[in-house]
Structures are given as C-alpha cells and as structure tokens.
C-alpha cells in the first residue's frame, strides 16, 4: 500500500515518485498502487518520444508531409502556413534522394528553402526540429561571420566541415544532412545596382554560397583550414545537402507594399500606410523581384525556390509558447523548482505580462527566456536557503516588479486549496 510509516494513515502517496496527495493535483488509484498526474504526464512524454521514432512513412521510407507537420506542431506554436510549406518541401527532397538511383531519365532538381520572418518567430527552431524528425546531421551557420576565401573571416567551406563534425565524420551521412544559414538578409548588397568595389561579406559571400548550395564536391580539411595546410582533405558532395536560409529581412515589407501600391498619384492613389497591415501578411506576398531589390543577387534567389514566410507572434501565441510545447519555458523552470522540492505557479496575468514585454521589446519568442530569468532571479537566489516552502506563486504584480513572489508553506498551501 502506498503509505509511509509515521505518517497519517489517511495520506496516500504516488507509488512511482513518492509525492503525497497534497503535493500533486490528482492521485489515480489502481488495485494496489497509486500514480500521480505528474508521473502520467512523464509517461505520456516517453510514449510520444518513442512514437516520434516510428513516424508513418511512405513506400520510400520518408515520413509523410502530414506526419512531419504534426511533429513540428509539438515544438513550434502557430506558423501553420510555413510548416505546411516546409513539410512538403522536406518530404519531396528526401523522396527525391530515395529514388535517385532508381530512375535516371528525369533528373529532379533540389529545392532549397528560404525562411522569411521577424526575429524570434521560430525560423531556427523549425530547421532544428526538421533535422531531428528525419534523424539527419544538422548544422547552423551565421551568414554575418562568412567572408570570401582569402579574406579574414570564416570560409564558406567551414559550413560543410561543421556538418561533417555533426555526422561524426561520416561523409555519407553528412551528404544527406541539413544546413541552416541564419541572417542571410545581412549579406545583401547595399543597393540593387552592382558595385564596382569588392564586397567580401555581402555579394561576395552570396557568390561563394552559390557553389555549395547548387552542388559541388567540396574539399574539407578535417582539422579546420588555415592552420593545418599539410592535412589530407575529405571530399564531400553537397548536391544532396538541403540548405535552409533564414532572415528577418527588416524593411522588405516596405518594398513589397511599394510594389503593390504602384506609382499612382492624385486623387485615385492608394495612400494606405503599410503599417496598417500585419508585417506577416505583407511578407506572404513576397516575390523574387522584392528580394532582388532588397539586395540578394538573382543567382542566389534562384537557388532558393521554396519561400516560406512566418508571421509576427501576438500575445496569445507567445503565451502558448510559454506553456504548451513539450519543452515550454514554464515547464523548464517548473522542473528546476521541482529539484528544490517546490512547485512553481505562474498565473495567467503573469504570463500576459511576459508576453506583452516580449512584444514591446520586439524580440518575439527569443526574448522570453531573458524576461523569465529577470522575473525569477531573486526567487532562484533565495529559494535554496529557505525551509518548508512548498509553492511559489508568480502573479501579474510580481512579473511587473511591483510585488514580491508569494511563498506558500505546507499549512498555507492546504488552506488555499493548492
């Protein structure tokens, strides 16, 4: 029976984690054992993780677009349109690889992907989750650190080296991997007219990326390039590596709105301010000519035929991000507090304050952790030295810095019905 010696005979305990009925929301009784709601949730997570490795696959051995999208839903809130585009593009890419040796009369070209969306909207997380679903090597690169070969900075070939390292130097696995290049909007040339001066970190990098994105056999130095000139190089064919490029493209919405508005003047002109529309809605109308005007070269745009745009995250979406995903921030901090034997309780008002602050800072989901850290800093500093605290309540006033967190001890918690 799940009771402990010395305790009241009426107190029941979870047979798995040992928590009492007063420490958990629900205790479910079996014939001879009890299980709490927290252990049930943990079991569900284990089953979900196991199911993820047994995704429904087509005859090609590739997960279906619907299954890919379903797993993306577990980690990324909203962005349904972008998730559908990515799911289809990734499914087609790996289906193409599965059939590469079977039928050579028609060669299907590779479709690399461009993700356009505001900071903190989930571009990086989408790319990382895709690689995890497909169990392929994944690496990230920051376009702002890249320069043309021969200049101070990181060579484009270093991206392939990182992918090779992610594949434990298994060349065959690396050749089926995914590369995510962030901040590609920062390597746009400064105007849409070709420059007579050398642009080693802008147009020059775009030119250098073209080669590996289209498909080439790159000679990769296993120990890094410039410091070990005598080492033997590994040959990596980039033809089947999927490249996903992402960027915020600040100001692109104005270029799109200007194109849509035309050059009308006089009484019949459309004088609507583009800011009246949501940025995400405007970005969805993006055309190659807009990216060209932004500063990407035509050849680079041509290597990225699939364009997925992401929406701005509103307050409701940010609150969902804080609470719903498997690795949601509230769950992460809740687990940290559990390690101290304390339950963390964020009220709805507190979550609204956190979301509103992220919107005000224009940091999207990326800024949520920083805001949570600031709110919980003093609590996490004091808590390890406090005795008999069973629950910490963070409400709207605490989140705004106008009040101290509410520490509930055993007796107080029982009185409040927690």
From Swiss-Prot:
Gene Ontology BP, a term: proteolysis involved in protein catabolic process
Cited Pfam families: AAA_2, ClpB_D2-small, zf-C4_ClpX
Domain ClpX-type ZB: 2-55
Residues the record lists as binding ATP: 118-125
Subunit structure: Component of the ClpX-ClpP complex. Forms a hexameric ring that, in the presence of ATP, binds to fourteen ClpP subunits assembled into a disk-like structure with a central cavity, resembling the structure of eukaryotic proteasomes.
Function in brief: ATP-dependent specificity component of the Clp protease. It directs the protease to specific substrates. Can perform chaperone functions in the absence of ClpP.
PANTHER family documented for this protein: ATP-DEPENDENT CLP PROTEASE ATP-BINDING SUBUNIT CLPX-LIKE, MITOCHONDRIAL, ATP-DEPENDENT CLP PROTEASE ATP-BINDING SUBUNIT CLPX-LIKE, MITOCHONDRIAL-RELATED
Annotated protein name in UniProt: ATP-dependent Clp protease ATP-binding subunit ClpX
Organism lineage string: Bacteria, Pseudomonadati, Pseudomonadota, Alphaproteobacteria, Acetobacterales
